[in-house]
């Protein structure tokens, strides 16, 4: 009997082990044949996959492993051959982007084929007004990227940026700006970190030029070590990513240490790089002075139509320009400075296009054809004899145009020549530089857009862990998307990591910062949120230690903080509460019903006022009508305001003195005990 039980247990263990193994047996001939054909085509259909999969029940983890394995082989799983699109890159993302981390490993799927079919099933095409569903549907239409796809897009981003930088380096405006920035650095009005990208410059050429990638085993080991470290931290703190108050994924004390280290490292890098950068800027300034002389000479010759530079001068011009481009590229300028240079270039180009557009429209108004105008104008922007040459043209409209609009044409061309003088190069050269910068910027922007759209699933998988913390799900997604875009800008594919590994931190940081900054009805600065988190965590720890809530004095002693600061933080940490909050089990009353209204009249005071009004009316009615009216007008009883003797006298067509006498007589009557007794009780109360 014992032997039988032992055999059953062994069989059960064997089944469990089999269920955790891979779905595809790579030693099977049918599987080998299917994979070989799929690699050749780049995809495999669901029917072909189901034919080689086992029919027994499998776990969701096995399904995910199989999909990841096929993706790593470069095989895309599709519904059928008609659904295959040309050029689709069927990669898989990491665990964050691919599936729900909360799913249980032991949960059983109906079968391997059915589960895979369900995993690839598309969203229904029925209409919906739910913005979340609409967003998810649009997001799902974008294919995931393989590692090779990510690297290809990252290279396109880098190439576009290099093209843009190369264009900027050919513009004299860039060198003028660099000389100004050098002077600001010398004067101490600008920090080095505001001009160059410290981290990129500090890492040196080896970080950029290293073509080799880290081994997958090393990357996987680093990832597992980071996960173990995170689990240990959570177990030690007894909390999830964020405290109850809402804040960062790291404990505040660790964040403060990280920030201090970051600040120190930035200062250290700045101090170390400053001599090298200043030397480069000095070289740029000296070289540009030599180049500027040749540029001015070239522009003057074009304006005077006296020829061009000699061949020796042209060679020298090219050598100086190459030296400047090499020096500028070695600086790794800050992105904000690059944007400022591009904006300056585009602003001048906008003014140029406006002037050229005015000239073209003016010519077309005299019947000059557009193609004819462009043929005569392009390349002769700075030719001083252009007016004379177009006046001799026999084509329709040219003579009338040159004769009638002589003054206007000269004014417009003078503005164009001023732009050439401002840029230091010819108009055709300036236009070529602008097109080069625009091309690089456009290519980089398109590639960044593709990278962002392909990783929107990663934002969803991270954002869903931060729901019910004060922000709507769509707001969390959009904040995460902002972090994703920052990650795309800063991603360095040469380090060998997948983009999702790098982007996760940026996305989580953007989401947690937004929760800390926006989740509360009354905004609290992020640095104060971190202090609140620290106090809440310490308070929870002390509650376990001493068995009661700690006092502010105990918290101040434990945290080594001033008592007043602890009290202030505890006061700030209180959450607003709605006046409509139900009170009691029956929920027929609300919190607002129990709050005193300081401006409202008390019921007893209202009763006294009503009784006084009624008694005063009865007492005044015992006087003559004339006396009653005089008293009412003089003291404003039952009226909006009181009246002077003069105003009352005008009403009765008598003198002020007569009104005073009537008033005095009426007051004497009121002092009689029969009347005053009725009013005295109000005076006493």
From Swiss-Prot:
Motif stretch (Interaction with polymerase core subunit RpoC): 475-478
Region (Sigma-70 factor domain-4): 619-672
Major location category of this protein: cytoplasm
Compartments in which it is found: Cytoplasm
Disordered, as annotated region: 1-26, 83-132, 206-263
GO cellular component: cytoplasm
Biased composition (Acidic residues): 92-105, 251-262
GO biological process: DNA-templated transcription initiation
Biased composition (Basic and acidic residues): 1-18, 120-132, 217-239
Renumbered residue ranges of the record's region Sigma-70 factor domain-3: 530-606
UniProt induction comment: Expressed during exponential and stationary phase growth, under autologous control.
GO molecular function, one term: sigma factor activity
Region (Sigma-70 factor domain-2): 451-521
NCBIfam families named in the record: PRK05658.1, RpoD_Cterm, sigma70-ECF
Family: Belongs to the sigma-70 factor family. RpoD/SigA subfamily.
Oligomeric form and interacting partners: Interacts transiently with the RNA polymerase catalytic core.
Protein name: RNA polymerase sigma factor RpoD
Native species: Rhizobium etli (strain ATCC 51251 / DSM 11541 / JCM 21823 / NBRC 15573 / CFN 42)
């Amino acid at each position: 009997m014992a032997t039988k039980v032992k055999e059953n247990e062994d069989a059960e263990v064997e089944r469990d082990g089999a269920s955790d193994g891979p779905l595809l047996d790579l030693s099977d001939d049918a599987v080998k044949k299917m994979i070989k054909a799929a690699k050749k085509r780049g995809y495999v259909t669901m029917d072909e996959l189901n034919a080689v999969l086992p029919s027994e029940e499998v776990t969701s983890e096995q399904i995910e492993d199989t999909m990841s394995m096929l993706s790593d082989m470069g095989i895309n799983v599709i519904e059928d051959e008609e659904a295959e699109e040309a050029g689709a890159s069927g990669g898989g993302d990491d665990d964050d982007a691919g599936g729900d981390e909360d799913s249980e490993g032991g949960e059983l799927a109906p079968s391997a084929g059915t589960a895979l079919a369900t995993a690839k099933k598309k969203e229904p095409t029925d209409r919906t007004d739910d913005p979340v569903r609409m967003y998810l549907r649009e997001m799902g239409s974008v294919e995931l990227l393989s590692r090779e796809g990510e690297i290809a897009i990252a290279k396109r981003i880098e190439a576009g940026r290099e093209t843009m930088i190369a264009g900027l380096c050919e513009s004299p405006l860039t060198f003028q700006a660099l000389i100004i920035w050098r002077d600001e650095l010398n004067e101490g009005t600008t920090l080095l970190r505001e001009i160059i990208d410290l981290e990129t410059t500090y890492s040196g050429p080896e970080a950029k030029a290293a073509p080799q990638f880290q081994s997958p085993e090393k990357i996987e080991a680093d990832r597992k070590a980071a996960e173990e470290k995170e689990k240990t931290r959570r177990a030690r703190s007894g909390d999830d990513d964020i405290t109850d108050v809402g804040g960062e994924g790291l404990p505040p004390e660790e964040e403060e240490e990280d920030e201090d280290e970051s600040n120190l490292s930035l200062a250290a890098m700045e101090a170390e790089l400053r001599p090298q950068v200043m030397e480069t800027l000095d070289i740029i300034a000296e070289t540009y002075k030599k180049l500027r002389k040749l540029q001015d000479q070239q522009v003057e010759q074009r304006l005077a139509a006296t020829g061009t530079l000699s061949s020796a001068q042209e060679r020298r011009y090219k050598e100086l320009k190459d030296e400047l481009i090499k020096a500028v590229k070695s600086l790794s300028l800050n992105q904000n400075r690059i944007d400022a240079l591009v904006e300056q270039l585009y602003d001048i180009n906008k003014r140029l296009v406006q002037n050229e557009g005015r000239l073209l429209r003016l010519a077309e108004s005299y019947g000059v054809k557009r193609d004819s105008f462009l043929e005569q104008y392009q390349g002769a922007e700075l030719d001083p004899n252009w007016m004379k040459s177009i006046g001799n043209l026999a084509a329709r409209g040219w003579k009338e145009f040159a004769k009638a609009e002589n003054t206007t044409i000269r004014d417009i061309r003078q503005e164009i020549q001023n732009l050439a003088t401002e840029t230091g190069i010819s108009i055709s050269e300036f236009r070529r530089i602008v097109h080069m910068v625009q091309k690089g910027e456009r290519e980089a922007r398109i590639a960044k857009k593709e990278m962002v759209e392909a990783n929107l699933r990663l934002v969803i998988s991270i954002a869903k862990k931060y729901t019910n913390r004060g922000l709507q799900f769509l707001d969390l997604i959009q904040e995460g998307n902002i972090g994703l875009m920052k990650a795309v800008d800063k991603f360095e594919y040469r380090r060998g990591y997948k983009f999702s590994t790098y982007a996760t931190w940026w996305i989580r940081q953007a989401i947690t910062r937004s929760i800390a900054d926006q989740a509360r009805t009354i905004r609290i600065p992020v640095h104060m949120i971190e202090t609140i988190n620290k106090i809440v965590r310490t308070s929870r720890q002390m509650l376990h230690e001493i068995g009661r809530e700690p006092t502010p004095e105990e918290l101040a002693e434990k945290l080594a903080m001033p008592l007043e600061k602890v009290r202030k933080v505890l006061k700030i940490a209180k959450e607003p509460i709605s006046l409509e909050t139900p009170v009691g089990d029956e929920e027929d009353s609300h919190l607002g019903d129990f709050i005193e209204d300081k401006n409202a009249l008390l019921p007893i005071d209202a009763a006294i006022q009503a009784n006084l009004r009624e008694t005063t009316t009865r007492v005044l009615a015992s006087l003559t009508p004339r006396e009653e009216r005089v008293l009412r007008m003089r003291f404003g009883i039952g009226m909006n305001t009181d009246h002077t003797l003069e105003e009352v006298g005008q009403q009765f067509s008598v003198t002020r003195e007569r009104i005073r006498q009537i008033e005095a007589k009426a007051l004497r009557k009121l002092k009689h005990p029969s009347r005053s007794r009725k009013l005295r009780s109000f005076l006493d109360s």
